[in-house]
């Protein structure tokens, strides 16, 4: 579930302080596979915590213990 507030996405993969693929500060380089869309996010953008990630044939979901869950299907509708 992704919470939408005033047109902005508030979820573990929304723009935040941390890189969702490395867990480092957001201004660090993103791995090539992640840039190509081949990797799901592994870290919460809001707090940098490691997320529980489940990859399925049709996408993925990721859950932060503090900021909730997001599903790739939910993100596809916002593109």
Swiss-Prot record:
Coiled-coil-forming residues are none
Q: Which cofactor does it need?
A: iron-sulfur cluster
| One GO molecular-function entry | metal ion binding
Q: Which domain of life is it from?
A: Bacteria
The cofactor note reads: Probably contains an unusual Fe-S cluster.
Biological processes annotated in GO? biotin biosynthetic process; symbiont-mediated perturbation of host innate immune response
Knockout mutant characteristics = The deletion mutant is unable to grow without extrabacterial biotin. The growth defect of the deletion mutant in biotin-free media can be complemented with biotin but not with another intermediate of the biotin synthesis pathway.
UniProt keywords, alphabetically:
Biotin biosynthesis, Iron, Iron-sulfur, Metal-binding
The family this protein is said to belong to: Belongs to the BsaP family.
Relate the protein's function as given in its record: Required for the activity of the biotin synthase BioB.
Q: What is this protein called?
A: Biotin synthase auxiliary protein
Which organism does this record belong to?
A: Mycobacterium tuberculosis (strain ATCC 25618 / H37Rv)
This chain is encoded by the gene named bsaP
């Amino acid at each position: 579930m992704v919470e939408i507030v005033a047109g902005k996405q508030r979820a573990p993969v929304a723009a935040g302080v941390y890189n969702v693929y490395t867990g480092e500060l957001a201004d660090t380089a993103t791995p090539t596979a992640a840039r190509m869309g081949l990797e799901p996010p592994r870290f919460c953008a809001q707090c940098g915590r490691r997320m529980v990630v489940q990859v399925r044939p049709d996408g993925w979901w990721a859950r932060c213990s503090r900021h909730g869950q997001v599903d790739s299907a939910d993100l596809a509708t916002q593109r």
